[in-house]
């Protein structure tokens, strides 16, 4: 029996991926793995539980390797979407951001290896490229861990996608802007020159599924995306007001580093990035004493500085 496990499956991306999978084959096994009971219940109303063949819902912690392994039973594909994504939340709670985004990814990778999952894809972000924020740091380190997992599995092909912002996601700035527009309030913009990559939720889900099908072991895939001036988009909702930075951010995001350009190949509508080997991912995979490294926010901050320096040097 084949099936797909989606971590963070009750989130906006996970739900759209599930919709597309169900539309293609309503009888395939899809395991929605997340820790949000409310979101799972809401999703059940749209996509009912279908028994052995169909959607199944499992509550679980992303750091629980045993629970993940149980969830992967009868699955042959894994899509790892689960993450803490709010930049300000990650800055305020460095420990939890690292636990979920980094250690959670390590747990998923280990469960995939243990379960002999043939294909597994990680959903990364442009903020992992030359990171400046805690969120970017955790996603960048998770990328390294995921890709380096190929060194420790003969049966699983680990690959990743890396892209910008999704317009219709539940945590998109556009939801906040629409609320402010309805209230007649100014539209906050951090910097007049800031740009961001955007595309639709449907395109994001479709890209992940296609790369899961045809992607190659150890490759990071980035779509050809358009960058937009945020100030211009804000004008569609009301009067923009410049607020300044609340958290570490960049004026312009990029989908690969200058150094990665030498290892990046155009595939038409997307790019294949052959990542240079970094020590971080393999260090974690072979059993780094994570409890000592990530035992406090101070330790994590020191580690984050070393990681960012190593990726931007």
Regions found by a protein language model. Give the residues of each.
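Conserved glycine-rich Rossmann-like NAD(P)H-binding loop of the short-chain dehydrogenase/reductase
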Residues: 25-39
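Conserved beta-strand scaffold in the Rossmann-like NAD(H)/NADP(H)-binding core
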Residues: 57, 122, 160-162
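Strand-loop microenvironment adjacent to phosphate/nucleotide-handling motifs in alpha/beta enzyme folds
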Residues: 143-313
């Amino acid at each position: 029996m084949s099936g797909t496990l989606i971590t963070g499956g009750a989130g906006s991306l996970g739900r759209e991926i599930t919709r597309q999978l169900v539309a293609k084959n309503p009888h395939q096994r899809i395991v929605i793995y997340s820790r949000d009971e409310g979101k799972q219940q809401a999703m059940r109303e749209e996509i009912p539980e279908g028994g052995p063949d169909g959607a199944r819902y499992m509550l679980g912690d992303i750091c629980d390797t045993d629970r993940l392994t149980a969830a992967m039973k009868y699955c042959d594909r894994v899509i790892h979407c689960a993450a803490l994504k709010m930049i300000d939340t990650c800055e305020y709670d460095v420990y939890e951001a690292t636990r979920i985004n980094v250690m959670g990814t390590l747990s998923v990778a280990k469960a995939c290896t243990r379960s002999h999952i043939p294909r597994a894809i990680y959903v990364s972000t442009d903020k992992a490229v030359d990171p400046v924020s805690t969120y970017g740091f955790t996603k960048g380190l998770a990328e390294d861990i995921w890709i380096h997992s190929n060194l420790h599995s003969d049966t699983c092909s680990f690959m990743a996608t890396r892209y910008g912002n999704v317009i219709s996601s539940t945590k998109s700035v556009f939801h906040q802007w629409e609320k402010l527009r309805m209230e007649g309030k100014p539209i906050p913009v951090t910097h007049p020159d800031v740009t961001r990559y955007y595309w639709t939720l449907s395109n994001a889900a479709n890209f992940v599924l296609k790369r899961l099908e045809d992607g190659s072991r150890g490759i990071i895939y980035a779509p050809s995306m358009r960058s937009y001036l945020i100030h211009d988009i804000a004008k569609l909702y009301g009067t923009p007001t410049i607020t300044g930075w609340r958290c570490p951010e960049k004026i312009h995001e990029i989908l690969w580093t200058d150094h990665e350009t030498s290892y990046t190949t155009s595939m038409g509508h997307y790019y294949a990035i052959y990542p240079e080997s970094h020590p971080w991912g393999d260090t974690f995979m072979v059993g780094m004493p994570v409890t000592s490294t990530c035992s406090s926010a101070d330790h994590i901050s020191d580690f984050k500085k070393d990681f960012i320096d190593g990726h931007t040097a």
